[in-house]
Regions:
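Cell-envelope and extracellular/periplasmic
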Residues: 68, 76, 105-111, 133-141, ...
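Catalytic His-Asp segment of secreted/periplasmic serine-dependent ester chemistry enzymes
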Residues: 172-256
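Internal alpha/beta domain cores that form substrate/cofactor-binding pockets in large enzymes
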Residues: 60-62, 99-127, 139-168
């Protein structure tokens, strides 16, 4: 069916998201039951993010996962500066202009959570990040729910043991999935990731719900996609907006 969004409009929305961090293509993401709240979850980072030289320090966000955070658009093309890790960094840097905010991608195309867990200590924790995001839902369909849960849990627990804050991401859209079918593997993996966020009381970016809100309003997610399973810049900007909110909506700790 014809796209309800023209390319100029998509461009305007993407620019607005990047520069302001306040415009949503699909509206506000549904709330998920978890103890994590944006105003306090990363409150320990409020001081380093707002500090000025010479008192500021590097704040590291590591984005771990598969081809989406790696920046794959239409395979084999990689566009890291149009992907959500980089776009998130731009939004956060605009919010905290004196911060030294560094985003590092440890994502590998084609990887699932078991493979990501196997190299988590060496590739992620060794970098001593302040925050790590985990995004494997799309590829975990090929290993099943039980194996995926075990791998996600191992990464979450390893990060927490190292004092690293964790933000989970549900999968971005896939035009081959049937989100209206409760038994669709992508639906099931998105649900399991939400459960993990609740179980561990950690932050969540519900990318799957945002893409579905867009589909409900526009009849298709095609304007957000570069190919069936990879978002385009507009899709990445949608994820970046929500991820950045965990940093930009921080309130000062009570002691400050």
């Amino acid at each position: 069916m014809p796209s309800p969004f023209s390319m100029p409009m998509i461009f305007i929305l993407v620019v607005a998201v990047i520069l302001a961090g306040t415009v949503s293509v699909a509206g506000t993401a549904p709330s998920v039951t978890t103890a994590a709240t944006r105003s306090t979850y990363l409150e320990s980072l409020h001081t380093p993010l707002t500090a000025k030289w010479p008192d500021n320090r590097l704040v590291y966000l590591v984005c771990h996962g598969h081809s989406v955070p790696a920046g794959y658009f239409r395979t084999p093309t990689i566009r890291p500066f149009d992907s959500y890790p980089h776009l998130t960094g731009r939004i956060v840097q605009d919010r905290y202009p004196t911060a030294m905010f560094e985003v590092v991608r440890t994502a590998i195309g084609g990887e699932n959570a078991e493979q990501g867990a196997a190299r988590f200590a060496e590739d992620v924790l060794a970098k001593k990040p302040d925050v790590v995001t985990i995004d494997y839902g799309l590829n975990d369909r090929w290993i099943g729910l039980d194996r995926a849960r075990a791998a996600w849990s191992s990464m979450i627990e390893a990060a927490q043991a190292a004092g690293v804050e964790v933000i989970l991401l549900t999968p971005t859209g896939d035009t081959s999935a049937n989100p209206d079918d409760a038994s669709d593997p992508l639906v099931l993996h998105a649900g399991q990731i939400r459960e993990l966020a609740e179980e561990y009381d950690i932050a969540l970016v519900d990318s799957f719900a945002m893409f579905e809100q867009y589909r409900a309003g526009h009849g298709t997610i095609e304007p957000l996609m570069s190919q069936s399973n990879h978002p385009n810049r507009a899709g990445h900007a949608l994820v970046a907006q929500e991820l950045a909110r965990w940093f930009t909506e921080l309130e000062p700790p009570a002691a400050e």
